[in-house]
């Protein structure tokens, strides 16, 4: 009952802030306010838009919205998303560029599974597409996975990464962003010991908590209490 009351309180705060943001956006973007020289209304509309978006629930997975990429020939080439490895808790997908020869450089982006979809790395994918074959871990929302599929913990997460790296082979460059950095390191170390032929060519860790004590934060301080 205590946890339910806490959840209800947080949900009430979320919906209230979402409503405040929507109200501010509606009032600030009203056509009549645009006639006034005071920038307050534009600022209120911008604040309202950001606030409403921040406190809204992500009900539907955002689309990648990567339709074309400019090739070396200066032309637009169609980008298709194809599934390479399909698993209950996440897939390995590939951004296939039509009309272009496969690039020699192969990059695996390990996206975070921390309340965001892999589309959070959309801009990173777009920046890599002209120069590399881009793959990414497309994690599923846990609420959409039936209990019959079993558990998914740190060991399972690491096993998924090992499987994805094996599927792509030794010539892959792995880039782990934020939360999966330690697990990508563990998966790479596992392959280095047990299957060197599948070990990635390089491993880049961006913003990951490899050594939390290296730069103490409020979170690490709280963990020591």
Which residues make up each language-model segment?
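N-terminal cap/leader regions of alpha/beta-hydrolase-fold enzymes
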Residues: 1-225
């Amino acid at each position: 009952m205590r946890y339910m009351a806490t959840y209800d309180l947080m949900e009430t705060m979320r919906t209230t802030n979402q409503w405040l943001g929507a109200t501010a956006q509606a009032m600030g973007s009203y056509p009549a306010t645009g006639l006034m020289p005071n920038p307050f209304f534009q600022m209120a509309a911008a604040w309202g838009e950001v606030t409403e978006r921040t406190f809204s629930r992500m009900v539907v997975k955002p689309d990648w919205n990567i339709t074309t990429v400019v090739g070396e020939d200066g032309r637009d080439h169609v980008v298709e998303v194809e599934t390479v490895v399909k698993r209950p808790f996440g897939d390995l997908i590939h951004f296939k560029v039509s009309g272009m020869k496969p690039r020699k450089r192969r990059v695996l982006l390990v996206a975070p599974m921390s309340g965001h979809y892999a589309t959070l790395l959309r801009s990173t994918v777009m920046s890599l597409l002209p120069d590399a074959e881009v793959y990414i871990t497309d994690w599923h929302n846990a609420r959409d996975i039936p209990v019959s599929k079993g558990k998914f913990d740190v060991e399972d997460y690491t096993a998924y990464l090992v499987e994805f790296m094996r599927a792509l082979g030794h010539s892959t460059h792995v880039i782990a962003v934020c939360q999966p950095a330690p697990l990508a390191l563990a998966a790479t170390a596992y392959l280095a010991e047990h299957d060197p032929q599948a070990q990635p060519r390089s491993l880049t860790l961006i913003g990951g908590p490899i050594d939390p004590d290296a730069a103490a934060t409020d979170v690490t301080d709280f963990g020591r209490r």
